C-alpha cells in the first residue's frame, strides 16, 4: 500500500521581504548596540529609523499588485498588506523620532527599547499579511509580549511596572479568549485557513452554533486588543503609568494593526456571517462612544484623557466595520491612520514640555503655553481641532467618511448618535485649548523645552494634519485601493 503525500511547494520568500528585513535588522540593531558605547547610542537610533524606511519601501515593492498567497496558504500579499505595512512603518518611524530626546534625558536610551519596538512592529506586519488563524495569533502575541516589556521599560518607576503587570494579566486573559474562539472556529470548520473558513461560513455558518460561539469569543478578544469599551480598562492605567514615549507608540501603529486584525478575521474569514457579528460591533461602537467621551470629560490627567478619547475614536473606527462594505472598511483604515498621526502629535507635545523630574501629565501644565511658545500652542490647536473633527483638518474627513459609511447602509440613527457624541467630545479637547490660550502660566511652570529637531518634528506633524485635511484625496485613494475600490 502506498501513501500519497502532497507535493511540497517552495514558498515565495520575496513576498515576505518586509518581515524578513525587519527580523534581520532587529537582530543587527541588538548586536550593534551590544558593542556600542553609551556615547554612540545615536547609531542604534539611526539604524532603527533606516530599517523602517526600507521596510516601507519593501512593502510597496513586495505587495502592491496582484494578490498572491504563499507559505502553504498562511500568508497573503495584496494591496491591503502594502498600505497597512507602510502605515505601520511610518507611524513606527514617527514614534521613534519623538522618543529619542525623552529617553536620552532620562538615561533610558538603550538599544533594547528599539529592538522591542522593531519586534512589535514585526508582529503588526505579520498580522497585516495573515491568511491563517495561527498566523494571526503569532503576530498578535509578538506584538503583545513586546508591548508588555516596553510598558515596564523604566523598571525604576513603580507606576510603569504596575501598569505593565495589569496589562499583562488582562492581555493574557484576552489572548486566551481569542485563542479559544479560534479553536472553536477550527473545530466547526476543520480548517485554520481564512479562505476555507469563509467558504464554510457562507454555506452553513449562520446555523452552526459552534462557529457562532467561536466568532463571539474572537470579537471579544479583538475588542480588547483594540481598546473598545467595555474591554478598554487597561488603556488609562497603561497610558498614564508607561513612559510617555511608550504611550505614544501604543496609541499609533497598534491601532492600524488592530484594523488589520478586524479585516482579516471578520471581513475575510467571517464576512459571510456579517449579519451575525454586526450587532456585536454596534454595541461595542455605541459603548465606546458613550463611555470614552463621558469618562474623558472628568479627567485632569491629559494622558488618561487621551486614553479615554482613544476609546471614543475606536468607536468611530468601528462604524466603518459595521457597514460591512469595502468602502466602510477603507474608511476605518483611513481613520486609524489619521488618528495615529494626530495621537503622535498630542503625545509629542507632552514629551516636549516634560523633562527629567517633571512629567507634563496634568492638563493644567499646559497653562499659558501660548505665552511660552506660540508655535507649539498653534500645533496643539491644530491637533485638538483635528481630534474634535473641525472642518479643514484631517479629523473632520475621517469622521465624515465613517459616518457616511453607516448612513449608506441605512443606519441613520447610529450616524446621528455618533455626531451627538462627537459634539460632546469637543468639550474636553477645547478645554485643553482654554488652558493653552486663556490661562496665565503658573509662576513655577517649567520653560518650554525640547531640541530644535523635536520642535521641527512637531511643526511637521501639525502641518501634516492640516494638509491632509485640505488635500485628503491621496490617502483616501490609497485606503480605497487597498480594498479594490476606486475613489472619486
UniProtKB/Swiss-Prot annotation:
GO terms for cellular component: plasma membrane. It catalyses: a quinone + NADH + 5 H(+)(in) = a quinol + NAD(+) + 4 H(+)(out). GO terms for molecular function: NADH dehydrogenase (ubiquinone) activity; NADH:ubiquinone reductase (non-electrogenic) activity; quinone binding. The chain crosses the membrane at residues 15-35, 42-62, 79-99, 108-128, 133-153, 168-188, 209-229, 243-263, 277-297, 305-325, 333-353, 376-396, 409-429, 456-476. Keywords: Cell inner membrane, Cell membrane, Membrane, NAD, Quinone, Translocase, Transmembrane, Transmembrane helix, Transport, Ubiquinone. GO terms for biological process: ATP synthesis coupled electron transport. It is a multi-pass membrane protein. InterPro entries: NADH-Q_OxRdtase_suN/2, ND/Mrp_TM. It holds the Pfam family Proton_antipo_M. Its EC number is 7.1.1.-. HAMAP family: NDH1_NuoN_1. NDH-1 shuttles electrons from NADH, via FMN and iron-sulfur (Fe-S) centers, to quinones in the respiratory chain. The immediate electron acceptor for the enzyme in this species is believed to be ubiquinone. Couples the redox reaction to proton translocation (for every two electrons transferred, four hydrogen ions are translocated across the cytoplasmic membrane), and thus conserves the redox energy in a proton gradient. Belongs to the complex I subunit 2 family. NDH-1 is composed of 14 different subunits. Subunits NuoA, H, J, K, L, M, N constitute the membrane sector of the complex. This is NADH-quinone oxidoreductase subunit N. It comes from Alkalilimnicola ehrlichii (strain ATCC BAA-1101 / DSM 17681 / MLHE-1).
